Amino acid sequence: MIDLNNLDLATAGDSGFDLQLLHPVDKSELEGMKIRIRGDKSKTVAAFDRKRINELQQKERVLKGKNKELTFTTDELEKMAVEAAAVRVISWQGISEGGMVLDCTPENITHVMTKYSWMRDQVREASEELENFRPD
């Protein structure tokens, strides 16, 4: 018999996965550069997604009452992508910029996910891969 606790993707997703960053061009491992990330099924990410959907639905209702459609600029879409990636970051190691080590703070996470879209893409892709968060 299988115990459902062994299939709890929400808990496993919040525990995290150590993502080994890859070079954006040649896909070689960037030695020492790792980001611990939450999975898409984690409670934290699910709560973020619910909040985002509720906000967008509310905005859409208000605009609909004014006979307007909900649209987004490229900057708004990028900001949403950055926020969605940032909520998945738990911690990191080996991340530096300009010769200085970057501590894993909310400000630095937002900065890195904004400036280095390839890192943001890797975080999102690894977060979506359920195998990375398979409960033991």
Where are these regions (language model features)?
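Short, intrinsically disordered N-terminal pre-domain segments
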Residues: 1-13
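Short acidic, Pro/Gly- and aromatic-enriched capping/linker segments at domain boundaries
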Residues: 11-24
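Short, surface-exposed, charged amphipathic helix/loop patches that serve as local interaction elements
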Residues: 29-136
